[in-house]
From Swiss-Prot:
Gene3D superfamilies: Urease, gamma-like subunit. It comes from Rhizobium etli (strain ATCC 51251 / DSM 11541 / JCM 21823 / NBRC 15573 / CFN 42). Keywords: Cytoplasm, Hydrolase. GO terms for molecular function: nickel cation binding; urease activity. It holds the Pfam family Urease_gamma. One of its GO terms (biological process) is urea catabolic process. Coiled coil: none annotated. This is Urease subunit gamma. It catalyses: urea + 2 H2O + H(+) = hydrogencarbonate + 2 NH4(+). Heterotrimer of UreA (gamma), UreB (beta) and UreC (alpha) subunits. Three heterotrimers associate to form the active enzyme. Transmembrane segments: none annotated.
Length: 100
């Protein structure tokens, strides 16, 4: 299987998001990369489903709460930017203050 660097990045984020979901199910708090992966995966999958950019920007801020991440992680993440493929092309989606 020959994958482009972008496809490899998407798979890596998706796998990290799967790990993050499993940890949340076990009650384990997420670290920085896991939190970023979970939010990014939400945006990428939402774009694939055809959800509008504005909706993903708003909904992306409700994927993870402060009590689901390790201490100090929420303060470290001010914005998450994801290049996602929508039915009408690739767009940059920015989720501001994603952990509230």
């Amino acid at each position: 299987m020959n994958l482009t660097p972008r496809e490899k990045d998407k798979l890596l984020i998706s796998m990290a998001a799967i790990v993050a979901r499993r940890r949340l199910e076990r009650g384990v708090k997420l670290n920085y990369p896991e939190a970023i992966a979970l939010i990014s995966d939400f945006v990428v999958e939402g774009a694939r489903d055809g959800r509008p950019v504005a909706e993903l920007m708003e909904a992306g801020a409700h994927v993870i709460s402060r009590d689901q991440v390790m201490e100090g992680i929420a303060e470290m993440i001010h914005d998450v930017q994801v290049e996602a493929t929508f039915p009408d092309g690739t767009k940059l989606v920015t989720v501001h203050e994603p952990i509230r």
